[in-house]
Curated annotation (Swiss-Prot):
Biological or metabolic pathway of the protein: Glycan metabolism; pectin degradation; 2-dehydro-3-deoxy-D-gluconate from pectin: step 2/5
Comment on pH dependence: Optimum pH is 10.
Keyword Methyltransferase: no
Natural source organism: Bacillus subtilis (strain 168)
Name by which UniProt lists this protein: Pectate lyase C
Note in the entry: Hg(2+) could replace calcium ion.
Molecular function via GO: metal ion binding; pectate lyase activity; pectin lyase activity
UniProt cross-references to Gene3D superfamilies, sorted A to Z: Single-stranded right-handed beta-helix, Pectin lyase-like
Temperature profile: Optimum temperature is 65 degrees Celsius. Thermostable at 50 degrees Celsius in buffers at pH 7.
């Protein structure tokens, strides 16, 4: 009898313990079921909170037509946000946008996509685990990335394949490692890249299709 009671007691402990094991989505995470819109000329400060995409937005794979977790409108700023997995299609920008200290723990379809012409500045933050590209540029723009760390991706920046519009890419004070293809890939003969004060290693061909390149004070390691 004592043996049976002991077995039942241990079974109860195991069952109770298993109920309190954390899932991949932690209690402090904010699960986003509908894209968060950052309105024109406003600032969204996530205060370091971690956001993950609900199934309504997408599964974070390379499947096309997933929705973003954040849509940032012209003149707006998104800052102090952590994007966990799944991140669906990350962040979409529409116009002149500032992205400050945003971290992508596991890039989904893309970390960020430029959807409308403008000046996009990414200052601080990091991104990793991108099976294809980290940043996707779909419209003519000036695209600046500074004080950023990127690791383990296909490409750091990709201009829309087959497009000929003009893009100016500016990379400053970044650390870029383990890109399978390149830092920047474009099919446009007019697009430019300017990279300064940046450390990089194992980045594939470095530049693919880029015909206008300026580099200064960079370190390969």
């Amino acid at each position: 009898m004592k043996k049976i009671v002991s077995i039942l007691f241990m079974f109860g402990l195991v069952m109770g313990f298993s109920q309190f094991q954390p899932s991949t989505v932690f209690a402090a995470d904010k699960v986003v079921h509908e894209t968060i819109i950052v309105p024109k000329n406003t600032t969204y400060d996530g205060k370091g909170q971690r956001f993950v995409a609900g199934k309504e937005l997408g599964d974070g794979s390379q499947s096309e037509n997933q929705d973003p977790v954040f849509r940032v409108e012209d003149g707006a700023t998104l800052k102090n946000v952590v994007l966990g997995a799944p991140a669906a299609d990350g962040v979409h920008t529409y116009g002149n946008v500032n992205i400050q200290n945003v971290k992508w723990e596991d890039v989904g379809e893309d970390a960020l996509t430029v959807k409308k012409e403008g000046k996009v500045t990414i200052d601080g933050g990091s991104a990793q685990k991108a099976s294809d590209k980290i940043f996707q540029i779909n419209k003519a723009s000036t695209f600046t990335v500074k004080n950023f760390t990127a690791d383990n991706g296909g490409k750091f920046i990709r201009q829309l394949g087959g497009s000929t519009f003009h893009v100016d890419v500016i990379i400053d004070k970044c650390t870029i490692t383990n890109m399978k293809e390149a830092i920047f890939r474009t099919d446009s003969k007019t697009s430019t890249v300017r990279m300064t004060n940046t450390r990089y290693s194992n980045v594939g061909q470095k530049w693919i299709g880029v015909q206008h390149i300026y580099e200064n004070n960079n370190t390969q390691f």
